[in-house]
Amino acid sequence: MSKSQYFALAALTLCAIQAQASLVMLGAQDFQGTGLGAVNTILTLQSPGSTSNESGSVGRAVGNPNDVITGNAMTGASQTQTRTAAELGLTTAAQLRVVFNALEPGASNSILLNNLQLNIFSAAGALLFNSGAFTAINFSDTFTGAGNSGFVFGLDAAQAAAAQSLAFGAGFGTNRIGLSANLSNATGGFETFFVANAPAQVPEPGSLVLAGIALLGMAASLRRRH
């Protein structure tokens, strides 16, 4: 299946997924240069030995100045760590995006994401927000290679409003973002999750031309009036 075909299929499933979950898949997207060092990776998982299940989390705890890392999370440089909202460039809860990137072999590159939860902690380690229940998603094609393609998640409207109230108030830039995840049918390398602010949409060239024509028309109209 080609990437364009898979992205179209993924889009058709979004409505059903969004009706059942708090952290919902918004779509699949190609990424270039999104290896571990190129993005703000929060969580990296790898199934131990010959097993096919992996789970882990990274978060904070009151009274502990360091990250609390559990399960099969990898702890190498830039692999697993909480990051501040300011470091991630976050602006609002509604604009927060979690991107899942799987590294599975070409012959068996499907994977099941059983659970994915977003946690936001205060600078002191108190849990301010948890995204709650998640509906499992089976990815029949993950496109091999770290950084090739990612699956983008965001909060549903209710959870975005709750997160905004609880964790995006005054001074929210010092709050820290953590994640927890559970996957099965993991037969390859490592799976990574990074967090970013939703990028501003770049207008299509045709849209820019139309906008330019409209502006020229407005300018001509103003000149005629004067």
Describe each region flagged by the PLM:
Residues S22-Q201:
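Helix-boundary and membrane-interface capping/anchor signal
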Residues L222-H226:
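Short, charged juxtamembrane terminal tails flanking transmembrane helices
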Residues M1-L23, A186-A220:
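Short, threonine-centered small-residue motifs that mark membrane-proximal processing/anchoring sites
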